[in-house]
């Protein structure tokens, strides 16, 4: 395969997030000195979209995924305008922080995305939540991973289509001080088993905020974050086991194995986004049988509206 190339609270509440460590290594300090000297931060430039597969087939499916950090706040920040311009066939949203009976009416204005499915905690308003919006009606839709311990927070939607199964997920954060790390490890094991079973029946696409930076290249300050949520050895190992056991491929790294400074999350603190001090926490993972259909995996880092940016997948099915 050729290779190419937290915050002020929103009005809909927020989930505590672990922020990047501010303490800098000597190497990071040198980078900061260079930036101060006028070189500026190293920003990621999303290359032109590749809309053909390795065999030359044209893309037939476009999927977007975005952690919106609260639907209502995201809409106020013109997130829907970006979606209308991007025009995906399927839109997956995470951290919606909105129960289904309080969904903003503006969502019905999205052109073509008429089949809409939502999951939210039954007892926690303004927390977690995921959504899946599609032009085509799925053959089947289900919610959660089938284990009561892990299905109380509205974190997973599964949609089966003719040639693949799509899972969108908002994976639990290990929390400040790693207070939920033990729970996260239990989640990782249960989620891995659930996905392996799904993938044994039909090719799988997993997308969403998976709340882990897999390798050092996937965050700006790896040395200072090894004991922070999202980059602990346990979480990284769990992600690696997910890739191997299901098995799945990281679509972005498959196409861009050595591309650095490509992030999808930046804390609202310390002007992190303008400095591109970020983390790659959002992914499209694919069954290996889908790799011949992979055209491109995009990070839309210039799209605003959340502390995450959207990502886009092109497939030629």
From Swiss-Prot:
InterPro entries: AP_endonuc_1 (IPR004808), AP_endonuclease_F1_BS (IPR020847), AP_endonuclease_F1_CS (IPR020848), Endo/exonu/phosph_ase_sf (IPR036691), Endo/exonuclease/phosphatase (IPR005135). The record marks 211 as: Transition state stabilizer. Its cofactor is Mg(2+); Mn(2+). The record marks 282 as: Important for catalytic activity. Expressed in both resting and stimulated B cells stimulated to switch (at protein level). Changing residue 232 to A: Reduced CDK5-mediated phosphorylation. Confers neuron resistance to MPP(+)/MPTP (1-methyl-4-phenylpyridinium). Loss of CDK5-mediated phosphorylation. NPM1 stimulates endodeoxyribonuclease activity on double-stranded DNA with AP sites, but inhibits endoribonuclease activity on single-stranded RNA containing AP sites. Keywords: Acetylation, Activator, Cleavage on pair of basic residues, Cytoplasm, Disulfide bond, DNA damage, DNA recombination, DNA repair, DNA-binding, Endonuclease, Endoplasmic reticulum, Exonuclease, Hydrolase, Magnesium, Metal-binding, Mitochondrion, Nuclease, Nucleus, Phosphoprotein, Repressor, RNA-binding, S-nitrosylation, Transcription, Transcription regulation, Ubl conjugation. Residues 15-37 have a biased composition (Basic and acidic residues). The active site is at 170, 209 (proton donor/acceptor). The record marks 30-31 as: Cleavage. The modification Phosphothreonine is found at residue 232. SUPFAM superfamilies: DNase I-like. Residues 1-58 are annotated as: Disordered. The modification S-nitrosocysteine is found at residues 64, 92, 309. A motif (Nuclear localization signal (NLS)) lies at residues 8-12. Gene3D superfamilies: Endonuclease/exonuclease/phosphatase (3.60.10.10). It is found in: Nucleus; Nucleus, Nucleolus; Nucleus speckle; Endoplasmic reticulum. Disulfide bonds join 64-92. Probably binds two magnesium or manganese ions per subunit. It catalyses: a deoxyribonucleotide-2'-deoxyribose-5'-monophosphate-DNA + H2O = a 5'-end 2'-deoxyribose-5'-monophosphate-DNA + a 3'-end 2'-deoxyribonucleotide-DNA + H(+); Exonucleolytic cleavage in the 3'- to 5'-direction to yield nucleoside 5'-phosphates; a 3'-end 2'-deoxyribonucleotide-3'-phosphoglycolate-DNA + H2O = 2-phosphoglycolate + a 3'-end 2'-deoxyribonucleotide-DNA + H(+); a 3'-end 2'-deoxyribonucleotide-8-oxoguanine-DNA + H2O = 8-oxo-dGMP + a 3'-end 2'-deoxyribonucleotide-DNA + H(+). The specific activity of the cleaved mitochondrial endodeoxyribonuclease appears to be about 3-fold higher than of the full-length form. Extract of mitochondria, but not of nuclei or cytosol, cleaves recombinant APEX1 to generate a mitochondrial APEX1-sized product. This is DNA repair nuclease/redox regulator APEX1.
